[in-house]
Amino acid sequence: MSKQPRKQRKALYTAPLHKRHNSMSVHLSDDLKEEFNRRSFPVRKGDSVEIVRGDFRGTEGKVEGVDLKNYRVLVDGASSQKQDGSKLYQPIHPSNLVLTEIYLDDERRNQALNRKV
């Protein structure tokens, strides 16, 4: 693996979707860190997150979507209203989020979370 910044950027921009999913990991809150013995976990729709940086800092909300193409997360609390009344979500980078509650209805995700790291 190269150390060159241009090759690192190229790898990020040209990564396939199944590999982008792992880079969409969000840090766990302190109590979740203790419970699951891991620092971060890939985010998905249905998780609850807290925004720790940016204009929406301190806002908690459910994840409404994950944009793998642009490496962004859409959070329910970080939205504005358009003129016609519809919601416009502000895309947020996963590094600016902390996972507060994990959506565990998915069995494979449950196994991945409890797997030894």
UniProtKB/Swiss-Prot annotation:
It comes from the Archaea. Residues 1-10 have a biased composition (Basic residues). One of its GO terms (biological process) is translation. One of its GO terms (molecular function) is structural constituent of ribosome. Residues 1-28 are annotated as: Disordered. One of its GO terms (cellular component) is large ribosomal subunit. Keywords: Ribonucleoprotein, Ribosomal protein, RNA-binding, rRNA-binding. It holds the Pfam family Ribosomal_L26. Gene3D superfamilies: 2.30.30.30. HAMAP family: Ribosomal_uL24_A (MF_01326_A). One of two assembly initiator proteins, it binds directly to the 5'-end of the 23S rRNA, where it nucleates assembly of the 50S subunit. Located at the polypeptide exit tunnel on the outside of the subunit. PANTHER family: 60S RIBOSOMAL PROTEIN L26 FAMILY MEMBER. Belongs to the universal ribosomal protein uL24 family. Part of the 50S ribosomal subunit. This is Large ribosomal subunit protein uL24.
